[in-house]
Design a protein with these regions (language model features):
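Long, contiguous binding/interaction regions
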Residues: 1-81
């Protein structure tokens, strides 16, 4: 068994309203920045024990589906470091 570091990035799917990003976009434009697009995402750093890298990825994927992301509105990317 080894210890694995992972990162999970969770963001809203295309077409889902992102009020946080819209507020930030308007504020940055008021500060003089010309933006075409901005999207907010969350980064989760997870350290866990697992039998293998594949087992770690399986566990992190399960955690993400069960709690970190709502598959109806979120997309996510998992990386085992």
């Amino acid at each position: 068994m080894g210890t694995y570091d992972s990162e999970v990035i969770v963001g809203l799917k295309d077409g889902v309203l992102d009020p946080e990003a819209e507020t930030i976009k308007r504020s940055l434009e008021r500060l003089g920045y010309d933006l075409q697009f901005i999207k907010s995402k969350k980064l989760f750093e997870i350290k866990l024990d697992a039998e293998s890298k594949e087992d770690a990825e399986k566990k992190v994927n399960e955690m993400t589906k069960r709690l970190l992301a709502n598959p109806t509105i979120h997309e996510y990317k998992i990386e085992i470091l």
